[in-house]
Swiss-Prot record:
Residues 174-176 are annotated as: G5. GO terms for molecular function: GTP binding; GTPase activity; guanosine tetraphosphate binding; translation elongation factor activity. This is Elongation factor Tu. Its EC number is 3.6.5.3. The lineage of its organism: Bacteria, Pseudomonadati, Pseudomonadota, Gammaproteobacteria, Pasteurellales. It comes from the Bacteria. Residues 10-204 form the tr-type G domain.
Amino acid sequence: MSKEKFERTKPHVNVGTIGHVDHGKTTLTAAITTVLSKHYGGAARAFDQIDNAPEEKARGITINTSHVEYDTPTRHYAHVDCPGHADYVKNMITGAAQMDGAILVVAATDGPMPQTREHILLGRQVGVPYIIVFLNKCDMVDDEELLELVEMEVRELLTQYDFPGDDTPIIRGSALKALEGEAEWEEKILELANALDSYIPEPERAIDQPFLLPIEDVFSISGRGTVVTGRVERGIIRTGDEVEIVGIKDTTKTTVTGVEMFRKLLDEGRAGENIGALLRGTKREEIERGQVLAKPGSITPHTDFVSEVYVLSKEEGGRHTPFFKGYRPQFYFRTTDVTGTIELPEGVEMVMPGDNVKMTVSLIHPIAMDQGLRFAIREGGRTVGAGVVASVIK
């Protein structure tokens, strides 16, 4: 049987379910695939198909994640659901499944719970741009006032973490009843799909973003000058473009006089391609791995930042012992390690393997970074943690 061709005709959007344990995230995921397949085509996925999520490795970290897909008339969605709380934490921090928006599931019978709060906070830290709320199990709550109270609590919680709580779409539904095919509750799933379509803007594709190439290697070619190689992270680079070399040393400007791929000259290099860029008037020793080539003014170098970090457990090959303030590991950004020191939040004395923690990092060299950049924490080449830049300090 030949594989079905992947249709690129519709915009592709990445979403996922987040929220407290047993509030119905996986049931909702099953309900979305079931109801949408009935109305718009596509494959329905049963609860147990989603719940026994396969193990994946992202940056050496074991994560259980289920990936499903579904369609609305205007979009194609890739949706990620995790069985356990720890999987969510790891997933969001490593960016294993980047989300353009999240569906926060809150049981109307419980209201917001500790993990509801933690997932919203994580969403803020790791840069999930939009959250839509599905108030689940509404079939079990007869009291309209109680529903309004829960809704108000959720809005306040979102506002507390800088999401627009007052304007967030909140859909009242019952994932289980929708899954069982009850028409009035199926309608709520269609309402949710509609909210996804209208509230989450179409994500900007990597190719439309400002050019950035992490430098992996530098060569000097006699008679031609200096060539840097790497995989274009975003944007497009064309022969004749002015670029900045950012990170580690002072930022300098240069012009790209040639772009090549597999030793062939090209007019341009695009996001996702491995290229070599020939730089005008730049000496081999002025550039090193770990710097980036970037569109002028699009990214700046920084040493100090706030991050959200997951520390690998012993079973994942991480440390066997906790670390304390003053810990000095290497932080691996894109292509290189930079030593840094850490500050722990007030009241946190130590961090155990398997924990996640907010920490402030100070690097010995500046690195080109902005919010959302992922990194690994390493000791002597061994990965012991994964993190994401939540905000830049200086």
